[in-house]
Design a protein with these regions (language model features):
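A generic structural signal for alpha-helix starts
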Residues: 71-74, 157, 262, 290
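Iron-sulfur cluster-binding cysteine motifs and their immediate structural context
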Residues: 256, 262-290, 294-312
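FMN-binding flavodoxin-like domain, especially the glycine-rich phosphate-binding loop
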Residues: 33, 51-66, 73-79, 83-103, ...
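Short, positively charged and aromatic/hydrophobic N-terminal segments
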Residues: 21, 27-33, 47, 56-57
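Short, low-complexity, charge-dense intrinsically disordered segments
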Residues: 1, 7, 11-15, 35-42, ...
């Protein structure tokens, strides 16, 4: 135990009465403490208050991590989990996940407690936040002075404006942005692009990013940092055919090979737009399709495919020009 004088007391400790004693601990390079309450100051007998969190040495006292994510095929969730679990283990606090992938999950906005660290994760669609989720994200971003982290994933082409757009929404919502990451994951359109991402190097970079976040959680004077891209973009990336001319597959929808389909029903419940209809156990694709590939990836029979010529030509373009490994990028 060590007595803390008024001159050396960190600002985050000054809310305690002067005659407190603090026990300090160091784990994973994170300094934490427990206030030890004097039962009788004259005799200097004291006890630990087990209900006091161990991380008040942080400039942002937090007791829970909240992960909000959109992840139709699971790649974005995996990246968010890696970051959250590293921070949760270091700080010894629980993690709560809030998916807004399915329509039913977007019917109610999340509410955030005053002691949470927010991690918001989304894939990049056409260089931005997926447009069908943008209104929800904007409305849900009421994070009032909470520390937060922005994460986007991208399929090895480019994250364009997605990360800057997400970070701006978090700042506009009142969040204290500590860091931002754009992480390469497998491109959901292709069977060959970035199929092993995130790889070992990505994981090492994510770990280093987490350590930087832990350091920033200890400071209240974090400086702002820049993120490439437009914070309020109005345009989306224009997909290209293999010959580099514009491709138009906005209305393209998957098809099901009924001879392969075993009527398992997995695809009905996984569509983020809820537009796959059940017709005698077989999927019928009606309504909006955002090309997330969730239905195709979950199909164990490889019965679901896309046959639109522009869409297939775009995949060929990606595989021809964007197969060379790109780097994940981190900002803090």
């Amino acid at each position: 135990c060590a007595h803390i004088s008024p001159k050396t007391t960190p600002k985050v400790l000054q809310k305690f009465p002067k005659k407190y004693i603090f026990a300090f601990f160091k784990s994973n390079n994170i300094m934490s403490y427990i206030p030890v309450h004097p039962v009788n100051p004259k005799e200097e007998i004291c006890y630990f208050n087990p209900s006091t969190p161990l991380n008040y040495i942080l400039a942002f006292p937090i007791s829970q991590i909240r992960v909000c994510y959109f992840s139709p095929t699971g790649g974005t969730l995996r990246v968010a989990q890696i970051v959250a679990e590293q921070l949760g283990e270091a700080l010894q606090i629980p993690i709560k996940y809030h998916s807004y992938t399915l329509p039913s999950e977007r019917r109610q906005l999340p509410t955030f407690a005053d002691n949470e660290l927010i991690i918001w994760a989304t894939p990049t669609y056409a260089g931005r936040i997926p447009n069908k989720t943008l209104d929800f994200v904007r409305s849900a971003m009421n994070i009032k002075d909470l520390p937060c982290i922005a994460i986007v994933t991208f399929g090895n082409r480019n994250f364009d404006n997605a990360l800057a757009e997400l970070a701006a929404l978090m700042r506009d919502g009142g969040g204290k942005l500590l860091g931002a990451a754009a992480v390469v994951t497998r491109h959901v359109f292709s069977e060959i692009i970035a199929i092993d991402r995130p790889n070992t190097q990505d994981l090492q970079q994510i770990t280093a990013f987490g350590l930087q976040i832990l350091e920033k959680l200890k400071r209240s004077d974090n400086l702002p940092f820049s993120i490439p891209g437009k914070e309020n973009p109005t345009e989306y990336y224009t997909p290209l055919r293999e010959d580099k001319t514009p491709a138009n597959f906005l209305k393209a929808k998957p098809q099901c090979d009924l001879s392969r389909c075993n009527a398992c029903g997995s695809c009905f419940s996984i569509c983020p737009m809820d537009t796959i209809q059940n017709e005698m156990g077989k999927p019928i694709f009606n309504g909006i399709c955002i090309k997330c590939q969730a239905c195709r990836h979950i199909c164990s029979q490889n019965a679901i495919t896309f046959t639109d010529s522009d869409f297939l030509s775009h995949i060929a373009m990606l595989e021809k020009y964007h197969s060379s490994p790109q780097s994940s990028e981190f900002f803090f």
